[in-house]
Amino acid sequence: MAIFIRKTHPLLKIMNHALVDLPAPSNISLWWNFGSLLGLCLIIQILTGLFLAMHYTADVSMAFSSVVHICRDVNYGWLIRNIHANGASLFFICVYLHIARGLYYGSYLYKETWNIGVILLFLLMATAFVGYVLPWGQMSFWGATVITNLLSAFPYIGNMLVQWIWGGFSVDNATLTRFFAFHFLLPFLILALTIIHLLFLHETGSNNPLGINSDADKISFHPYFSYKDLLGFFVMIFFLTTLALFMPNLLGDAENFIPANPLVTPPHIKPEWYFLFAYAILRSIPNKLGGVLALLFSIFILMLVPLLHTSKQRSNIFRPLTQIFFWLLVANSIILTWIGGQPVEQPFITVGQIASVSYFSLFLIIMPFASWCENKILSLN
């Protein structure tokens, strides 16, 4: 009876169907590991964040000092802080690779799973943004000021909206307190949505590299993919610990070692590296409202991808034309990330504008047209 308790117990039965006896396609590659890696990232971030919250003080006069206190006086506080800060970067690397895999292999045709995923991305970006403000360094303060100020672009309600978010007439104590509250709350919302994301995924089953129905060739998740995921865990933890122990400030900004000063503006205000592609799109449009809308659309365009799928095949694996444009999109996103970190001057302005137009064109026009051309070529044969 003990052997089958996982199949009969009301709680264990749910876990069993999700992690043990789940039928999975036999040919899913390493690209399918990123879902579980994201789960691990989320757990690491929640646990390290919880310990940091025990020692952090959400007050403008003490926030910076409390972070210094964590790094100097708390047992292994420096390690917890470095893992949390670099864990966010690794989280976004895994997210972007997970999305890229979904785009390449046509996983977006599971519309419910995909759309929940896009909402998860938006929440993750919001969490990372409010978290970046908490150390109350120069880039934290000015990043919060510049990004929240963008809401003033909305007609009629803009200025009121900004003051409502700030809790006053400038970024101050009320802003920091509420951002800390949001940063604590949002990961649990992400956790809840992740469960819904998995629920929708298990309704349809996983996609596979060929993009075809794999019902005839399924294997159980455990032990095959559980061990495969475990290997991914070890590799990711190795990278995270290497980053946190040897190069903890590699992906951070030197300006954040200076306490926030509303009277001194940093020479170049920029967000963390994982937002730079969207920041470059925002900056490439001279109009403020247009820039804000383009920024939002650069994320929410992912929701249109299932509607723009014109190909008769699901995966890109047998579609050389679409493959070329997919890799162009990847290269374009890397260029946008680089441009976002550069000062606003020529030739960076022009390159950013070309890359921004290319980004939207590839999604909305070029890739759907390439799929249509491939359909025509196939029908000729």
Curated annotation (Swiss-Prot):
The cytochrome bc1 complex contains 3 respiratory subunits (MT-CYB, CYC1 and UQCRFS1), 2 core proteins (UQCRC1 and UQCRC2) and probably 6 low-molecular weight proteins. Heme b b562 binds at H84, H183. GO terms for molecular function: metal ion binding; ubiquinol-cytochrome-c reductase activity. Pfam families: Cytochrom_B_C (PF00032), Cytochrome_B (PF00033). PANTHER family: CYTOCHROME B. It is found in: Mitochondrion inner membrane. GO terms for cellular component: mitochondrial inner membrane; respiratory chain complex III. Keywords: Electron transport, Heme, Iron, Membrane, Metal-binding, Mitochondrion, Mitochondrion inner membrane, Respiratory chain, Transmembrane, Transmembrane helix, Transport, Ubiquinone. Heme b b566 binds at H98, H197. A ubiquinone binds at H202. InterPro entries: Cyt_b/b6_C, Cyt_b/b6_C_sf, Cyt_b/b6_N, Cytb/b6-like_sf, Cytochrome_b, Cytochrome_b_C_euk/bac, Cytochrome_b_N_euk/bac, Di-haem_cyt_TM. Its main location: mitochondrion. Heme 1 (or BL or b562) is low-potential and absorbs at about 562 nm, and heme 2 (or BH or b566) is high-potential and absorbs at about 566 nm. Belongs to the cytochrome b family. This is Cytochrome b. The chain crosses the membrane at residues 34-54, 78-99, 114-134, 179-199, 227-247, 289-309, 321-341, 348-368. The gene is mt-cyb.
